[in-house]
Regions:
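Active-site helical microenvironments for divalent-metal-assisted chemistry
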Residues: 1-179
Length: 179
């Protein structure tokens, strides 16, 4: 029931949003994160947090709402995936990388699924629009490459998970193989 409630909650919170530079409803991303976590046999809490992972950062959701509806553990997982938008892009990304090194397994799994969904989307969009893809982001391609490579390195202890292997492979293709 928690997963069902999280889907409804996230769908309502993200209802007017689109994926960056596309007409794709934003909710597709949390649903893909849910699918990735499910395929990798993750816990219900990780799956619920994966569905909700962008609600604090990208909507008007308050932490108390998540804690009341889903509990403190899920709130903490969601908070671990949320960035402080008052900081610069580089500061936010460096903070994420630094924290990941000491984070819990569940936090790392949610992060890995989120980044895999993002990198899949970037790769598919690159196939459609080429180098114009990089114009959508708040950082140039070389900084995105640094970030995704650093995230992949920080998640290296997930190397027994299928999603990690796909993340590592897709990051390599997108940033090392394609010009």
């Amino acid at each position: 029931m928690k997963i069902h409630n999280a889907i409804i909650f996230a769908t309502l919170k993200h209802q007017s949003q689109k994926r960056k530079g596309t007409d794709i409803p934003y909710i597709v991303h949390p649903m893909e994160v849910m699918q990735i976590l499910t395929e990798n046999d993750c816990s219900e809490n990780a799956i619920v947090a994966g569905i909700l992972h962008d609600t604090l950062e990208d909507t008007d959701t308050r932490p108390e709402e998540i804690e009341k509806e889903f509990g403190k553990e899920i709130l903490e997982l969601v908070q671990s995936e949320s960035e402080d938008k008052s900081k610069s892009w580089k500061e936010r990304k460096q903070h994420t990388i630094d924290c990941l090194k000491n984070d819990t397994l569940e936090t790392k799994l949610v992060c890995c699924a989120d980044k895999l969904s993002n990198i899949r989307s970037m790769y598919a969009d690159f196939q459609n629009c080429g180098a114009d893809l990089w114009k959508r982001f708040n950082a140039p391609k070389d900084e995105l490459a640094w970030y995704y490579r650093s995230i992949t390195d920080a998640l290296a202890d997930l190397n027994s998970f299928k999603m990690y292997a796909e993340l590592k492979h897709t990051v390599k293709i997108l940033f090392d193989t394609i010009n």
